[in-house]
Amino acid sequence: MSDVFNANQFLKTVTSSPGVYRMYDAKAVVIYVGKAKDLKKRLSSYFRKNLTNVKTQALVSHIANIDVTVTHSETDALILENDYIKQYMPKYNVLLRDDKSYPYILLSNHKHPRLAYHRGPKRDKGLYFGPYPNGGAVRESLHLLQKIFPIRQCDDLYYKSRSRPCLQYQIGRCSAPCVGKVSLEDYQEQVRLATLFLKGKDHQVMSVLVGKMEQAASDMRYEQAALYRDQITALRRVSEQQEVSNASGDMDVIGAYYASGVACFHLLFIREGKIFGSRSYYPKVPVNTEVSEVLRSFMLQFYLNSDSQRLTPKEILISEPFEEQDELAKAIQAAQNKKVEIKTQVRGERASFLRLALTNATNAVNTRLSHKNTIEQRFLLLEEAIESTNKIQRMECFDISHTMGESTVASCVVFNREGPSKADYRRYNITGITPGDDYAAMKQAITRRFDKISSSGKIPDILFIDGGIGQLRIAQKVVDEKFVALDNAPTLIGVAKGEGRKPGLETLIYGENEESFTLPADSGALHLIQHIRDESHRFAITGHRNKRQKTRNTSTLESIAGVGPKRRKALLQYLGGLQEVKGASVSELVKVPGISLEMAQTIHDALRG
């Protein structure tokens, strides 16, 4: 505990009401946020002489000040605690790092509604289905829906601009309402059935389709009956792929496992008795934290995060009981205005779901620990191979990617002792150089990386350069200039490709003395170098391809006087791509919304050269 903080004096002023407390260190940084039913009793427990919890001892040793906020109830305190944790991200709290909004399927409010992927604020009018565990689950669902229900998925601008059916109609995945290929009544019926399907009422949809097929066959409308038959077949295949539970209703099932500093919460999302999706979460956990606190903190942030727009089911099953379960349920109920039960003692199908979630969480932690141990071992082998006297904490690797000098991009990827640190990855768009000059590109990238070195604080111990002696010399020169007055310059190592570019034959070169050396092909140290080199190459080439595609799609059109981003987008969407725009006649161009006859002629002349 800081010498400036007088715990006894402070505790005399604390009330016994419920509330939230914030603990600060000597730099006035919030290091812990907690809540209590009785603030005085809870805060007094931190300053007992017989503290045995190592984490609490470490926390108390850094306390310089404490702020207290009194609330009306313990439920209010829970909600405020979550808000403060999100705001301050305290060092000693369990932190749920995933804070992205969840994706939904949107059925728009339109004469001919469309099905679309949606993430973010619900500004568009319509029905929202979800949330889904991830974007891939939404896209897979949309793909399946297209096979069963021929409902449009194009945006409204594309819909308005159509004069003939698109490819989706030709392959049977859209009924082309844009050009009147389906009656309004039939289209709305497909929308109704899709809505039922998205609500999990497969059996009801099946009954309707079977009835329609039988009626069409009875009326000798055999072609229509065949369409219904195909819909039924597709629906049955999809339904068979989903695991069905005898446990009715909606529930979240949480399997919690914590070992060797790694925690995983595996969630099964059960909707209408089916496994709607699953997802694993790996919160940041302070050392020596109890499992019960980890689970409580995770659920607090997961279910009270207003930014996620999450719809919580009435039933939550958890594999580990913890104190304040009832209080947390009340807080969720207050936040979402619905009754919620948190259960641990369950039987039958629910118990089976809990076992499944716990198995997945356990396997995920063991896999992470195995990977973590492998990475750690490779770091040790690398330290031994290069005879490093210091522990390597951070490594970076640079690579350059371009096509004949076009759209040059440099990548910087970062590894720490747990593996890739993707939050620290950076790309640099290279400009103002002679196309294809890799040396100039490397110089610009390294210069930009270390331009603000005095305030960065994140200096790599080793800087790998994917290239030969020439690029390494350029990088070493920049580093020498940037670190001339500093003593923490990184060690530079060039990674030159071996004969035939075969892995295992790489030549490694020290930047300082240009001494070269090799490592055995089966060396764990070399595998680590190959890993960061390959990741740098992947990250660079992905950025380059994206930039090149964007340039090719935009520069040709936007270089034409009068064609800005909006007109470019309208042209590409209406006609289907850049090649189609180039091949369009003036009469076809003028049909695009926002393109006058004069503008159409200008575009036509510019593209035909």
Curated annotation (Swiss-Prot):
GO biological process: nucleotide-excision repair; SOS response
Localization, UniProt: Cytoplasm
SMART domains (UniProt xref): GIYc (SM00465), HhH1 (SM00278)
Keyword Cytoplasm attributed: yes
Chain ranges of the UVR domain: 203-238
Keywords: Cytoplasm, DNA damage, DNA excision, DNA repair, Excision nuclease, SOS response
Quaternary structure annotation from Swiss-Prot or TrEMBL: Interacts with UvrB in an incision complex.
PANTHER family: UVRABC SYSTEM PROTEIN C (PTHR30562:SF1), UVRC/OXIDOREDUCTASE (PTHR30562)
Stated name of the protein: UvrABC system protein C
Source organism (scientific name): Shewanella halifaxensis (strain HAW-EB4)
